[in-house]
Swiss-Prot record:
One of its GO terms (biological process) is response to oxidative stress. Belongs to the protein kinase superfamily. STE Ser/Thr protein kinase family. MAP kinase kinase kinase subfamily. The lineage of its organism: Eukaryota, Viridiplantae, Streptophyta, Embryophyta, Tracheophyta. Expressed in roots, inflorescence stems, flower buds and flowers. Low amount in rosette and cauline leaves. This is Mitogen-activated protein kinase kinase kinase ANP1. The active site is at 197 (proton acceptor). Its EC number is 2.7.11.25. ATP binds at residues 75-83, 98. The keyword ATP-binding applies. Residues 538-558 have a biased composition (Low complexity). Pfam families: Pkinase. There is a cross-link at residues 109, 111 (Glycyl lysine isopeptide (Lys-Gly) (interchain with G-Cter in ubiquitin)). Keywords: ATP-binding, Coiled coil, Isopeptide bond, Kinase, Nucleotide-binding, Serine/threonine-protein kinase, Transferase, Ubl conjugation. Residues 452-464, 647-660 have a biased composition (Basic and acidic residues).
Length: 666
């Protein structure tokens, strides 16, 4: 109240009016004073309710009409329900439909409605996201007992399914997948969204090696979940959970970074972290009490180990962000450049006599070729004097630029080779022809050396051993290449199977387009016209006449001959009649004109279907004629050979002979 009276007192400013100038000594009237107090209070806006800003306009996506879709075959099962293949009947786009039961698994109606509302709010949040490494959400459709979540369809399988089929991934594949995973996670974090359930089962891979983060079953906006101590809910899988998530002490984006490290260990070992030592409940207690990270495999490179140690920091604030991890040497592949530098220093020392270099090779028989592409074969010495570091800098393997790289580049992997580092390096080195002369000299030296070895009979066995060591790649290289080729073959096979599943949906979509086309609508206006069309095509007489009777009057054959079908026999009821009659001819011309105006996909589809039917009819007719011709040829050959009639006739005559001998009295 004191503030109220103080504001009123400060707002009261009495100014003399023109009448007051004439009557300076007269006090103001009580009514005038009350009016001034009222106006001052009104101007001070004390009793006015605060005006809230109008709510933001609804998103245009939400105002869009519901998607008309049709369910296909079952393609998987998720944490909340089953996943089916579907098709958008308006655009023909393939969908992945996740069906969540909303009636049978809940104790009360309130919990059911709360769960439905949570999922619908989640989809509304995620519909606005668009990134090459993120699964796109399209909307929700509620039914009586299910809630259908419409998602982008990704051909292929998840990382966990690939691990079950092929085993652990080589480090090159892990690097490629990790980079794309970080790109998608960086996009989510920039939009204030935590995934909170990153694992191999929630990462989808298409047949081109492009991965997409999926199953945002536990994601929320941080602004909606955060409290004074951070988010307080625990969702996810225990093996991939960060310690602060298990302890429920509040977590942020750094919990996703911990899950990224656990996913990398999963791809390297083929197993979930901690799964070999503890069950799920025991893993929760162990991670929550010790706060230690999963064991790191010893087979990894130093850069990969350093990457995992940074992701699996015990203190959440010490973990780097997704943007910082994208600049790590393991993700960028800088260890390849360092190895190439060592290779260049070795190749630049070829000024020493070549036999000494070969003696060094023979003295270390256990040395194997690194995956960078060491040039053990003499035939590859043509490129030995080119600087590998410069060539790799000119054409970076991972398509990384100074601005952080383009996210779309990671999806443009070669169709024929899953990872083509060696091919790119060789092609780049081959383009540098300014040192070709010196390279040819070294090649001549290698040929001379080979002839020298051929002259000495005692060195034949050593030469064959050395060539086997240099020509054949190491076991690790063969194993990695075999695994990569198996993964690509599996993804291609998966895409082919899914293409077979989508064929019935496409056929139904095209049939629906043909059904609602203008030409079919015109043909459905009159049933008599369809009957006349059928009689005209089959050359049948009218219903009122018998086929054996002649025409009673007029010439009905005139109308029959004038009838022509614009489609092949297999095109159904969409045929047009051109009967030589005045009124009918005018109406048919109008119909044909309107049909001619129809352009687009429907006409093309009808033409393709009619052509296919016509070709099938021609092929069937040719096959029948070919069978008849072959039968005639066979009979002629048998008659020329003296075999007489056909085998069927001989069988019948043989039966007659048996019956005659069986009954000699007849």
């Amino acid at each position: 109240m004191q503030d109220f009276f103080g504001s009123v007192r400060r707002s009261l400013v009495f100014r003399p009016s023109s009448d007051d100038d004439n009557q300076e000594n007269q006090p103001p009237f009580p009514g005038v004073l009350a009016d001034k107090i009222t106006s001052c209070i009104r101007k001070s806006k004390i009793f006015i309710k605060p005006s809230f800003s109008p709510p933001p306009p609804a998103n245009t996506v939400d105002m869009a009409p519901p998607i008309s879709w049709r369910k296909g075959q079952l393609i998987g099962r998720g944490a909340f329900g089953t996943v089916y293949m579907g098709m958008n009947l308006d655009s023909g786009e393939l969908l992945a439909v996740k069906q969540v039961l909303i009636a049978a698994n809940f104790a009360s109606k309130e919990k059911t409605q709360a769960h439905i509302q949570e999922l619908e709010e989640e989809v509304k949040l995620l519909k606005n996201l668009s990134h090459p490494n993120i699964v796109r959400y399209l909307g929700t459709v509620r039914e009586d007992d299910t809630l259908n979540i419409l998602l982008e369809f990704v051909p292929g399988g998840s990382i966990s399914s690939l691990l079950e089929k092929f085993g652990p991934f080589p480090e090159s594949v892990v690097r490629t997948y990790t980079r794309q995973l970080l790109l998608g996670l960086e996009y989510l974090h920039n939009h204030a969204i935590m995934h909170r359930d990153i694992k191999g089962a929630n990462i989808l891979v298409d047949n081109k090696g492009c991965i997409k983060l999926a199953d945002f079953g536990a994601s929320k906006q941080v602004a909606e979940l955060a409290t004074m101590t951070g988010a307080k809910s625990m969702k996810g899988t225990p093996y991939w959970m960060a310690p602060e998530v298990i302890l429920q002490t509040g977590h942020s984006f750094s919990a996703d970074i911990w899950s990224v490290g656990c996913t990398v260990i999963e791809m390297v070992t083929g197993k979930a972290p901690w799964s070999q030592q503890y069950k799920e409940v025991a893993a929760i207690f162990f991670i929550g009490t010790t706060k230690s990270h999963p064991p790191i495999p010893d087979t990894l490179s130093s850069d990969a180990k350093d990457f995992l140690l940074k992701c699996l920091q015990e203190v959440p604030n010490l973990r780097p962000t997704a943007s910082e991890l994208l600049k790590h040497p393991f993700v960028m592949g800088k260890h390849k450049e360092s190895a190439s530098t060592d290779l260049g220093s070795v190749l630049n020392n070829l000024s020493t006599p070549l036999p000494l270099q070969i003696n060094n090779t023979k003295s270390t028989p256990d040395s194997t070729c690194d995956d960078v592409g060491d040039m053990c074969n003499f035939g590859s010495l043509n490129y030995s004097l080119v600087d590998p570091v410069k060539s790799i800098q000119n054409k970076n393997l991972w398509q990384q630029n100074d601005n952080g790289g383009d996210e779309d580049d990671m999806c443009l992997i070669d169709d024929e080779n899953f990872l083509t580092f060696d091919g790119e390096m060789s092609s780049t080195l081959e383009k540098d022809c300014h040192l070709k002369k010196s390279c040819d000299d070294i090649s001549d030296m290698s040929i001379a050396l080979k002839s020298k070895f051929d002259e000495s009979p005692g060195n034949g066995e050593k030469e064959s051993t050395m060539s086997m060591e240099c020509d054949q790649p190491s076991y690790s290289e063969d194993d990695d290449e075999l695994t990569e080729s198996k993964i690509k073959a599996f993804l291609d096979e998966k895409a082919a199977d899914l293409k077979k599943l989508q064929t019935p949906l496409y056929e139904e979509f095209y049939n629906s387009l043909i059904t609602f086309s203008p030409s079919c609508m015109e043909s459905n206006l009159s049933n008599s016209k369809r009957e006349d069309t059928a009689r005209g095509f089959l050359k049948l007489p009218p219903k009122s006449r018998s086929p054996s009777r002649g025409p009673l009057g007029g010439s009905p054959s005139r109308a029959t001959d004038a009838t022509s079908c614009s489609k092949s026999p297999g095109s159904g009821g969409s045929r047009e009649l051109n009967i030589n009659n005045g009124g009918d001819e005018a109406s048919q011309d109008g119909v044909s004109a309107r049909v001619t105006d129809w352009r687009g996909l429907v006409v093309d589809t009808k033409q393709e279907l009619s052509q296919c039917v016509a070709l099938s009819e021609i092929e069937k007719k040719w096959k029948e004629e070919l069978d008849q011709e072959l039968e005639r040829k066979r009979q002629e050959i048998m008659r020329q050979a003296g075999l007489g009639s056909s085998p069927r006739d001989r069988g019948m005559s043989r039966q007659r002979e048996k019956s005659r001998f069986a009954s000699p009295g007849k």
